Amino acid sequence: GMIALGNPEGSDKASQLISIASSLGLKSSIVTSGPGENFESFNHGAIDWKEKMAMAHWVVNSMSMLTAGPSPAMAWSASMTFAELEGCRNVMIVDTPSDPESISMVWGQVIEKVRQIHVLFFTSHSLHAISELEGLDAHDFLSRVREKTLIPLVCGYSESDSCARVAHALDNIQAQSSGESEGLRWLAGFLKALPLSGAGIEGIRAAASWE
């Protein structure tokens, strides 16, 4: 299964991933504020992460959640720490915050968490923005990020050629993708297939080309 920290409207990238994963038959749920609570200041300490993670293989967060207010930012950090303790795998969707000025600040906070992240995914928009920020060529950006951070799977979707890419220590994989929802549909299917396809490079290749 899969859980994600999302806003109550379901308009963020992590919530979108959850609804796509559900439509693909993966048991998925969103962790958010309670009814009547203000999302930016909700009581995040009341979340029972242990219980939420009991059936989850993946815990999903999005980078822009850091700009949603103090409570979401603290829940963002807590969820990753609990995922490690509970034996879940952390997935980080790198998306672009609504205020482009804050991108270097939030990307810096993701970098501080790399040790806890198993799958890092860039939307095509953020791939362009962050490669520019880091002064890296977009062409080999994913493998450079993987070398720098040692995150096991660094993925991204590129709209220009409708391709999903996965950088792994043993290979750089390319898969044609419909590109629905900025590549999130590809990511949902990839995350659904990965636990079943085996951890070896062949399994990762098979999971990447699930479409």
Write out the residue ranges for each language-model feature.
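Ribokinase/PfkB-type carbohydrate-kinase core domain
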Residues: 1-180, 191-210
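Enzymes that process phosphate groups on RNA ends and nucleotide/triphosphate substrates
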Residues: 181, 185
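Conserved hydrophobic/aromatic "anchor" residues
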Residues: 186-190
